[in-house]
Amino acid sequence: MVILKKKRKNFSQNTVLRNNVKKIGSVGKPFDICFLPTQLKIAKEFAKECDQMDLVLNHCGVPPIASGEIDEWSKDIKSLSELPNVTCKLSGLMAYCAPGTSSYETIKPYVDHSLECFGPDRMVWGSDYPVVNAGKGIQEWIKVTHTILGNLSDDEAKKIASFNAERIYKI
């Protein structure tokens, strides 16, 4: 697995980087991407150019949960989900909550929107381990995950929990 965590505004627009990412895709490997919510339009450009490979958007596109600003993120996630080569990773959301507010109820609108846009066939679960332990910990994230997946059919839950990751990462 290879991950692009975008720090500089124009880093992912670098031609050499994009060509190297395409080489990763040419051998059947997926590529994880992590963009800030203000960079999701750039993520879409990146995904369009790398359309012959699987890209996995980490942390549901890093929604601005702490601020509660859902509108722009929602539009951009919807737009990004229109590209069939992009999968959304359900991970790390508790880290984006305001201090003391990380809970299922807090992340639910963002999870629901991600599921609505990508559907259970294009979502994968991630533990965000060991970073998750800086917050409420892996046990709490697993508990929240069980609540999220408990709202889905068994087949949908299995896809998100493991089957999609097995398919995309070929594990």
Identify the residue ranges that each predicted region occupies.
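Active-site gating/metal-coordination segments in enzymes
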Residues: 1-38, 45, 89, 93, ...
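Distinct, well-ordered alpha-helical segments
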Residues: 9-14, 37-51, 66-79, 101-112, ...
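Conserved, mostly hydrophobic/aromatic
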Residues: 24, 59, 88, 128, ...
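Aromatic-lined glycan-binding groove of carbohydrate-active enzymes
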Residues: 71-93
